[in-house]
Swiss-Prot record:
Gene Ontology molecular functions: endonuclease activity; lyase activity; nucleic acid binding; tRNA-intron endonuclease activity
Protein name, UniProt field: tRNA-splicing endonuclease
EC number(s) on file: 4.6.1.16
CDD domains registered for this protein in UniProt: tRNA-intron_lyase_C
Active site: Y107, H114, K145
Subunit note: Homotetramer; although the tetramer contains four active sites, only two participate in the cleavage. Therefore, it should be considered as a dimer of dimers.
């Protein structure tokens, strides 16, 4: 079991097995100065699968405690987690899409140089403005990616919609 330690809104490990197995082979997290950092979404996913253990000091954190930490920082954490888990379970590599104005950037199986999709997580009952949608599609188009809206319903089901420009 690979041990990670809580550090603010993420977790880290200096274990080389973590870096080799999780980062180099499965594309989780980011390596900075010899440490592998995972987001709380990534940590929750790996804890749920029994791949890692997260500690706060010496105390082991449960999956529910990690989820609660995420919820305290992000009101969309549960919806994002459902989408993250669904995409990972389908074999995609999922990374933060923050610099592209989306929740995730998604790569086909493996990690190519450029992601193919930007994913925006939207709870089913959210009110969306046309300007929000237009802005996100423009950014995706500008960086040559496909914009995907991941709609999460009250039953925790995820439906994906591709949103794109149509030229007449």
């Amino acid at each position: 079991m690979i041990i990670f330690y809580l550090s603010g809104d993420r977790v880290f490990s200096t274990d080389q097995n973590a870096i080799n197995g999780l980062y180099n082979k499965r594309y989780f997290g980011k390596v900075v100065e010899g440490k592998l950092f995972l987001s709380l979404l990534e940590a929750a996913y790996l804890v749920e699968r029994g791949k890692i253990e997260v500690r706060d000091g010496k105390r082991k954190l449960s999956l529910e405690e990690i989820m609660n930490l995420g919820r305290a920082r992000d009101e969309l954490f549960d919806a994002k987690y459902l989408v993250y888990k669904d995409l990972r379970d389908r074999g995609y590599t999922v990374k933060s899409g923050l610099k592209f104005g989306s929740h995730f950037r998604v790569y086909r199986r493996g990690m190519e140089e450029h992601s193919e999709w930007l994913v925006w997580v939207v709870p089913e009952n959210s009110r969306l403005s046309p300007n929000d949608i237009t802005a996100r599609v423009r950014v995706a188009h500008g960086v040559r990616k496909n914009m995907i809206m991941a709609i999460v319903d009250e039953d925790a089901d995820v439906t994906y919609y591709k949103v794109e420009w149509v030229k007449f």
